Amino acid sequence: MRKTSLLNSNISSVISKMGHTDMLAIGDCGLPIPKETERIDLALIKGVPGFIETLKAILEELQVEEVLIAKETEKVSPELFTEIKEIIKDTKITFISHEELKKELKDCKAVVRTGEQTPYANIILKSGVVF
């Protein structure tokens, strides 16, 4: 059995195959996921699992050098945005429109769908290197 915190085999598999600058998205339950992008659907019921707890778990495993966030997030969901900033600390944030974020999903290795229902609870994580 794994010793690290992330137990989901699908997420672990995607992360283990990621190289520098590859992208992984985490989204709320309403985020449209392109057909060509792998969907890892964790959503059970409204709010479960939550976006923040999913983000924290993934960041335990994935080295991230940059995140892409919809610029609408800060205005529409300021509490969520503040939590994200606290979690990612000094990681570079690139703001793009929500429409641009949805277009970027086709280039992600996978999208992890949560049960989150907070507006704009979506993020794209760009993989860094550990050396």
UniProtKB/Swiss-Prot annotation:
Lineage, highest ranks first: Bacteria, Bacillati, Bacillota, Clostridia, Eubacteriales
- Major subcellular location class: cytoplasm
Give the GO biological process terms. D-ribose catabolic process
Keywords attached to this Swiss-Prot or TrEMBL record, sorted alphabetically, are: Carbohydrate metabolism, Cytoplasm, Isomerase
Annotated active site residues, numbered on this chain, are: H20
Give the similarity note: Belongs to the RbsD / FucU family. RbsD subfamily.
Q: What does this protein do?
A: Catalyzes the interconversion of beta-pyran and beta-furan forms of D-ribose.
Q: What class of enzyme is it?
A: isomerase
NCBIfam families linked to this entry? PRK11797.1
- The EC number of this protein is 5.4.99.62
Q: Which gene encodes it?
A: rbsD
This protein is called what? D-ribose pyranase
Annotated source species: Clostridium perfringens (strain ATCC 13124 / DSM 756 / JCM 1290 / NCIMB 6125 / NCTC 8237 / Type A)
Q: Which residues bind substrate?
A: D28, H98, Y120, A121, N122
Q: Which SUPFAM superfamilies match?
A: RbsD-like
Taken from the UniProt entry, a GO cellular component term is: cytosol
Location comes to: Cytoplasm
- Subunit text: Homodecamer.
